[in-house]
Amino acid sequence: MHPEILSITLFGIVAAFTPGPNNFVAFYSGFNFGILRTLPHIIGVTLGFPFLLLCLALGLINIFKFYPLIQEVLKYLGTLFLIYLAYKISFSGPSEQENKNKNPIKFHETFIFQFLNPKGVLASIILVSTYINPGETFVSYTTQIIIMALIVSVTSITLWTFLGKFFRKFATNQKFINYFNYAMSLLLLTSIITFYL
């Protein structure tokens, strides 16, 4: 067992449960599309974040150290994707029927986004550089951290989706839904600002 598994888990919980792009999109999707249609997003985050951790542990972190420009480019690509996503959320369909025909965020979009999500990339770099060392404990520690990331990711993203579904009960008319979508879009844009502070 990793000697610092408790602090690793606490860090993972704080990183996963606090507001950020993945959680805002889960909240929005749960609100607008329900639990079942948000499953691709849930699975994309649940598998994508641990896969990012694995890639970093296996050497991607060294590429970032030697070529920091690559990490900067990924941050800017992630920012552009979030702006696009905020636009999509803000101007989503005006009617309930159109919403039923729309597809929420797809699995592959969410999975790939984990490599562009500045909050997730930063959390992963901290986890890998602080708690995983090359040597005889590498496989054991990496496995434990990835399992923790899987559990924390699925729990947090599912909770945010259920919160979105719960808030749907208060949506009494289309105007409320439009304002909700504008608010989620604004929160997503606000989360971008925090990456540059």
Model feature map: region roles:
Residues 2-69, 126-145:
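Juxtamembrane transmembrane-helix termini in multi-pass membrane transport proteins
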Residues 8-12, 45, 110-114, 149-153:
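Residue-level signature of transmembrane alpha-helical cores of multipass secondary-active transporters
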Residues 13, 17, 50-51, 87, ...:
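Hydrophobic/aromatic residues within the transmembrane alpha-helices of Major Facilitator Superfamily
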Residues 21-24, 83, 122-125, 157-161:
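Residues that mark transmembrane-helix kinks and helix-interface sites
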Residues 36-106, 163:
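Membrane helix-loop-helix hairpins that form the core translocation module of multi-pass transporters
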Residues 44-48, 111-122, 181-184:
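Select subsegments of transmembrane alpha-helices in polytopic membrane proteins
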Residues 53-57, 116-128, 186-197:
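Hydrophobic alpha-helical transmembrane segments in multi-pass integral membrane proteins
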Residues 65-94, 150-156, 160-163, 168-197:
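Selective transmembrane alpha-helices of multi-pass membrane proteins
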